[in-house]
Amino acid sequence: MTNALPPRFDITADEIDLVVAEFYAAIRHHPGLGPVFAVHVTDWPEHEAKIARFWRNAILMERGYDGNPFAAHQAAGNVRAAMFDVWLGLFDSVLKRNLSAQTAQSWSELAHRIGRGLRMGVEAGSVPGLR
């Protein structure tokens, strides 16, 4: 079955899988982000497969992802807005190591747009209701 929409940019599913695997390997070793993820992720291969499906959906227009990243990050309880800069910096370094400059830039721009939305959701979720 072919996708109705073209990919956002030139990348393969295998390249997406590689980036996701390397990113989460780096996350697990990061002194600040590793513990945040460790509280929530008990099955890393399953988590990586889910996130790879998210990116294949967002980039390749494959329809295999079922989830709500905004709700997941809000519900986590230990995700702070300031973490997104570190998170995205780490992601960018993985992109640059594994992809062509143009593909890394295209994916980085998409990740930063999504990251801004996630950050706003976390910030909005931390504001107390005044009514």
Regions found by a protein language model. Name each.
Residues 1-131:
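Core of compact, soluble alpha-helical bundle domains
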